[in-house]
Structures are given as structure tokens and as C-alpha cells.
């Protein structure tokens, strides 16, 4: 029987052809996350393994996914564009087309997910990037931030306050935990038993916490520093299913309920519990942006 197309967005034929083709534009990005005021610099190459030479101007566009709060939707807006003159990309070669330099200092007023699209003739490619506001995180006065559940945390909770609990993301801080992973395990824990079994994150993308940290329900490159931190194994006394803000998915061999970020009521107050160790990830634009958000 002939195989039927898979009913998923990632399996659409046009998405596969976008990277698996004879001619393709390649952008050598140093990273995927930036802060406003930075300059995106990247070498551009043309991979031409088709039957004909490729020639023409190379065009690029930076598209931003801007929130439309009135319609509760997102619109894709071109915020920057330009072109580079390319004389020729001979067949059978990988040719350097030039260097992109894009100033990320205007027309973007909030933290946004963007797509950088590059095109020459019929060859098109697109790369996701994230641009964050260049602001230092500041804990609101109404929130008690702590790395220990100390007497002050108990007092705040007893009085109906909010506690943000964020220890160092290491095994000594979370005894009943595993190291989380950005990707799934290799093959299976049954075949390679030294793996801890983490299978990536499931994210409540519409949670208010992510208003200034655009995300999908799964991890993308902006999650790399956070996704590889600890994930706590929830005790049996926690009613399942538990609706964590960030759930760490477990291997089929264990099926342990795990989380990296969740909120709950403790006594009269509210507790935001994090295993991400964001205070130690402030060298990353994405780490700073998530803590600020």
C-alpha cells in the first residue's frame, strides 16, 4: 500500500523541499538570540549542486511576529530588508555571496520572534531568531525571591504573599531530580541505560509569564540554556495530571511526573517554583529575558 502523507505541519512536502533541494542559500549565524542594539553579522553562502549556474541579486527580509492584542493574534511584519549583488554561483560549488549586517536597533519595540528569509532566484531559506529588550531583570517589590525556603519565605506565604523559589540548578538543590534535555534521549533508555530519560519540554505557551518571552508549546533554539538544567520529579502526593508551566517529558520506560517551572498555592500565599536556575544564566539574552518576563 502506498504511504500516505503525514497530517502534520512539519511533514508538509513544501517544508521538506525548503532545505532538501539542489540550490540553497545558507546563512552562517553565530547565534539565534539577540538583544536590541546588537548587529546581526553573518556570512552568506550559496550551495549550488543543480544542473545550471545560479545568478542574480540576493534579497533578505527580517520578518517579526508582532502581537495584535485587539484581535488576540499575531501578524507577520517585514521590519528590515535589503539585497546584495551576486554575480554568479557556478553549478557544483559552494560560493560565498557576502556578509549580512543587520542593525537590530529600531522598529522592534518588544521582545519578538523573527524569521530571517534569504532568497536568490528560486532558492529560498529561512532562519528563526529572537530579539529581546536590553533591560536587566528586576524583581517586583510584591514578590519575595529566594534560593532557599527560609523563614522569610514561610512568613510571606502565611501572609498571603508571593514567593519565587529558584535555587541553583544542580543536583544538590533538587535531590529528587534528573538533568533535563533539549532533545529526546538517544534511541531509548532500554538500549543505552546510562541516560536519565528526559525527553524535552512541554510548555504552556499562552501563560502570562511568556508575554515578553515568545515561545511555542515545545522548545526551540531560544530554550537551549534553560532546557538542559534540572527537572524535579514530583512526589506521589501531587494529583495527576499536574498542569505545570514547563513540564519535562519522561521516557516511556519510567513515566515519572516532572516539571521545571510550576506555580501552586501554599497556605495563604502563592509559590512559583523554578529548577531553571535563571539567576545563573544571565550571560544569555534568553536567560535574562525569561527572568525579566
Predicted regions and their residues:
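Short amphipathic C-terminal alpha-helix that caps PH/PH-like domains
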Residues: 287-293
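Extended substrate-binding grooves/exosites of carbohydrate-active enzymes
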Residues: 1-39, 45, 67
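Beta-strand-rich interaction surfaces with strong enrichment in secreted/lumenal proteins
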Residues: 30-32, 83-90, 104-105
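Hydrophobic beta-strand core residues of beta-sandwich domains
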Residues: 34, 88-94, 108, 157
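Beta-strand-rich binding/interaction modules
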Residues: 39-86, 96-103, 110-120
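Short beta-strand elements
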Residues: 83-88, 122-140
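Short alpha-beta junction capping motif
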Residues: 141-188, 268, 274
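Catalytic beta-strand/loop cores that center a nucleophilic Ser/Cys/Thr
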Residues: 171-173, 187-285
